[in-house]
Amino acid sequence: MPLTKYKAAAVTSEPCWFDLTAGVQKTIDFINEAGAAGCKLVAFPEVWIPGYPYWMWKVNYQQSLPLLKKYRENSLPIDSEEFRKIRRAARDNQIHVSLGFSEIDHATCYLTQTLIDPTGEVINHRRKIKPTHVEKLVYGDGAGDTFKSVTQTELGRLGQLNCWENMNPFLKALNVSEGEQIHIAAWPVYPGKETLNYPDPATNVAEPASDLVTPAYAIETGTWTLAPFQRLSKEGLKINTPEGIEPETDPSTYNGHARIYRPDGSLYAKPDKDFDGLMFVDIDLNECQLTKALADFSGHYMRPDLIRLLVDTRRKELVTEADPHGGITSYSTRQRLGLDVLLDSDVQKQKKSGASDLGATNALAY
């Protein structure tokens, strides 16, 4: 039986821009802080490591190149000692960690979310299915075996989505169908509505994300919904501005947008503009009971005989090979990245020391 009452936290803070090492350490610091506060769950924003590349919305191709190169150099591989440090922090604090980061795999970056359990194991590894608009400059698409979200945990059925995935009706329907109870709506860094210039639609500023999309997710799914958000400082504005361009001087429009909502869509918590840190919530899963009794879109309030969703979780390979028995060789992304190997197992230790044989190395290599 899952816990029905527990403490959780959502991060609203400034990332360590373009700095993988510092970003990993800041992540561990927040995990330690949440653990010391008695939290069972801590949730980080979208691509918290090494920060959301908001510059891609404001620069041309040539201006983007130095920033893009540095961003890729500081993105986080899954099968790395840096990521294992974060997993160990989850284990040390006996806490679930929902972590958003720029994952680099081969030569492609992905908008990745992982759910790490209190033993340090990765129980959900997902990639944003479609980067939004100019995000395609930086990131690739998730695959069939990396987009599902909802995971059964001791905290209940927990799901996580990135940014505008939270307003995708098909992903929302999929999560509802799997009985989601707690949702992480991970957001990047966004300017406020005062920056809006016609014809840019209001979809593209922070307030609709914080105050329309996120509570709509909560009320439509009947879930506790935590919305961690990144922040910006004056120094962060400078770091994210290409050379030769005058940086913005007022970061306040980017701050104060994190939220936590109850299962009925009512606001539980929002930060002050100058708040940087953890937002806490006392979750009671029984608050989902009446919201779902009124509108359970995966059960008594749906008509699957009339409306159904087709989901394909197969990975589509660029190259397929025949196996010795005449079938098609296939693999899962999870297996290729070594996520099926227990944290600090003998296989991982051998790999770290270089003592593993070639076959074991190839099985876990990128």
Swiss-Prot record:
Enzyme class of the recorded protein, top EC level: lyase
Pfam families: CN_hydrolase
GO BP annotations listed: cyanide catabolic process
EC numbers for this chain: 4.2.1.66
Catalysed reactions listed for this entry: formamide = hydrogen cyanide + H2O
Alphabetical UniProt keywords: Hydrolase, Lyase
Matching Gene3D superfamilies: Carbon-nitrogen hydrolase
GO molecular function: cyanide hydratase activity; nitrilase activity
Induction, per UniProt: By cyanide.
Start and end residues of each CN hydrolase domain: 6-285
Family from the record: Belongs to the carbon-nitrogen hydrolase superfamily. Nitrilase family.
Assembly mode: Oligomer of dimers, forming left-handed helical fibers.
Name of the protein described by the UniProt record: Cyanide hydratase
Protein's gene: chy
